[in-house]
Amino acid sequence: HGLSLSVPEGKVTSIIGPNGCGKSTTLKALARIWPCYKGNVTFNGEDIKKFSHREFAQKLAILTQAPQSPADLTVKDLVEMGRFPHRNWFGRKSMEDDAHVEWALGQTNMLGMQHRLLNTLSGGERQRAWIAMALAQRPQVLLLDEPTTYLDICHQLEVMQLLEKLNRELQLTVVMAVS
């Protein structure tokens, strides 16, 4: 049951397969959520175990299949959470954090919705908010587990077009699991 996977930098890579084949497990291993007991996972040639949690979170962001949040969280509150790996010891926001949050909201067309509660958004809007949070993290790699599974076809297209735009304009490496 070995796996060898090389992800080209600045490209979109899809891991495709039926339910239960290990797509989510692979993403979680890449993100250090689940440990690799055999073999290793490297990032730019370095074993991912060598990075501190903070360093690794500055390099890689992951969105799971069905992310959860408190009901009273606004879009902006969620996106600000993406800046935690970059904050100082006391967790205070900086002007740089504010700029990255604003940038991420703009990239995902969520600036006009930043004060709305997440639970008032459509499925596609909510997914864009979560992607904005990951972008605020300013990762080199974005892992997405079934990013369009729970969306209707119009919202699926909207999310996929956003990912294509981010990849093209930012050279963001995207790895996604899809059925």
Regions inferred by a protein language model and the residue ranges of each:
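Catalytic Walker B motif of ABC-type/P-loop ATPase nucleotide-binding domains
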Residues: 142-146
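Helix-to-loop junction immediately C-terminal to a conserved catalytic motif
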Residues: 31
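Conserved ABC ATPase "signature" region
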Residues: 80, 95-113
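Conserved ABC ATPase signature
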Residues: 117-121, 125
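Conserved catalytic motifs of ABC-family nucleotide-binding domains
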Residues: 138
